[in-house]
Amino acid sequence: AKSTELLFLNDTDWQAFADAADVRCEDLATMEGLTAAAEKYYNWTDAQTAAPDDGKALFGRDAMANYMLVGAQQLGDTIFAVKDGRMTVNFERDVARRLWDNYYVPFVRGWFAATGRFRSDDIKTGNVLAYVGSSSSATFFPARVTNDANESHEISLKTLPAPQFEGGEAVAVQQGAGMVVTAAKEKEVKASVEFLKWFVRAENNIAFSVGSGYLPVTRKANDMQEILASGLTLDDNMQQTLTVAVDTVNGNRLYTPHAFAGGSSARKVLEYGLSDLAAADRETVEQRIAEGQSAAEAEAEFLTDEYFEVWYQDICAKLAQYEG
């Protein structure tokens, strides 16, 4: 079973903002457009209260390593360049800056957020209106929002393609679960192979994959007509999610990093190296605002070229430890 990443939107609350601020779903097609929309949402929500600098975040993200790896691919970099099982870091400064400017900067300024364990949790509490996550996470999208005041209302889901970097190559992540045949008696290996052949037949793989919220593993089965013809019952959320997911798989170059020694640990550097810093610095900004500083004063230290450079050198040094 396979999956990719999509953008999941609380369309109910988005519509009120979109109408008031003259923004559209099309604005969320690029990371730059998403960042600009998030700034507008922060300002729009900030203006609804008398307190200064208390706007809300529009967006959050699961799987930060995917943001880094796939975003770099879109911009022409392969961060983990692997040959013969050995990895070389290839993380150009200008690519790193685009990633920084479209995650760290909006996060520190309160336009992006990550509070719950998963971003679908942040949708449920109203902390964000949209998130990028696995296509399989559609089953976890909440039907209601309940805020800190215990006020609750129903919401509807709109599924969109994951935003990509403006002017970059169309690249999407490929991920999911696989199977292997382990060493065994010849008869057992042959039986395992026969099972796998049966399992990946379109009719069987569609039933298993789609029924569990994933995508089929063959090109033939990754077709909405094939999926609809399978007879599976799909609710509106799953049908729109599968439609966008299938379009994503068929309309992008799919990317997954090659394996190398220490690859899991190196991936963790990308998973947490930007997001943890952003969360810690946003907390500092909020403390400073609570003490009376303006948002501009509280954020200034973190928005300099020098601050980016320190992070860039640090993450490159950490990644270099896993080079072959």
Where on the chain are the PLM-derived regions?
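Hinge/lid segment of periplasmic solute-binding proteins
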Residues: 1-6, 15, 154-163
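Short, solvent-exposed loop/beta-turn-alpha elements that line the ligand-binding surface or hinge
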Residues: 24-26, 77-98, 147-152, 164-170, ...
